[in-house]
């Protein structure tokens, strides 16, 4: 990451992190074609995340005095999940995501974590490729669901084949 730092989250970062969370939600809305994802104020989900897991293992990427990235680590024994991870769209492809990932991996190793997971949404192909290139190449669990709306939503696209089964995403 050029001319920036990764540092611990501090309460004055709240608004910038809400904005990053909102930007990620807007990306999800775009790739799924569903404007209701995240509700009316998706930034509030960052507040809920903080209330649920705390800020002890939350870091921001800062450049020129501005928060441009965010990453968190949720530890459960020898397993941990990276949540959230987001880089401002204007700052992508500049090494910020790599720097955030390296910070989380370093922390996880220091804590004795054996397995680190990340759960990008299925249609975020750029994120999936990014994580794959970083080394996330093992599937630990797969989340499957049924659309119970009547009729089922038409937002689902034909998706990948996995273990001989075709999925939508």
Identify the function of each model-found stretch.
Residues 47-60, 81:
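A short helix-loop-beta-strand connector motif used in the catalytic cores of GNAT acetyltransferases and
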Residues 4, 11, 22-48:
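Conserved GNAT-fold acetyl-CoA-binding loop/helix
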Residues 118-128, 144-150:
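Conserved beta-strand-loop-alpha-helix junction that forms the acyl-donor binding cleft
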Residues 87, 93-106, 129, 133:
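Conserved acetyl-CoA-binding loop-helix of GNAT-fold acetyltransferases
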Residues 60, 66-74, 81-86:
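Conserved beta-strand in the GNAT
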Residues 1-15, 158-169:
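Conserved N-terminal entry element of GNAT/NAT acetyltransferase domains
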Residues 108-119:
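Conserved GNAT acetyl-CoA-binding A-motif
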Residues 21, 131, 136:
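Conserved active-site tyrosine of GNAT-family acetyltransferases
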């Amino acid at each position: 990451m050029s001319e920036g730092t990764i540092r611990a989250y501090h309460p004055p970062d709240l608004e910038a992190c809400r904005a990053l969370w909102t930007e990620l939600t807007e990306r999800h809305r775009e790739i799924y074609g569903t404007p209701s994802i995240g509700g009316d104020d998706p930034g509030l989900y960052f507040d809920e995340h903080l209330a649920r897991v705390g800020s002890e293992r939350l870091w921001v990427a800062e450049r020129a005095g501005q928060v441009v990235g965010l990453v968190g680590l949720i530890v459960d024994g020898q397993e941990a999940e990276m949540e959230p991870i987001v880089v401002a769209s204007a700052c992508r492809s500049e090494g910020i995501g790599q720097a955030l990932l390296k910070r989380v991996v370093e922390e996880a190793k220091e804590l004795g974590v054996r397995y680190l997971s990340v759960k990008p949404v299925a249609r975020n192909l750029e994120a999936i490729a990014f994580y794959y290139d970083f080394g996330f190449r093992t599937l630990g669990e797969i989340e499957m669901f049924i659309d119970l709306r009547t009729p089922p939503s038409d937002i689902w696209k034909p998706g990948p084949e996995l273990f001989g089964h075709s999925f939508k995403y």
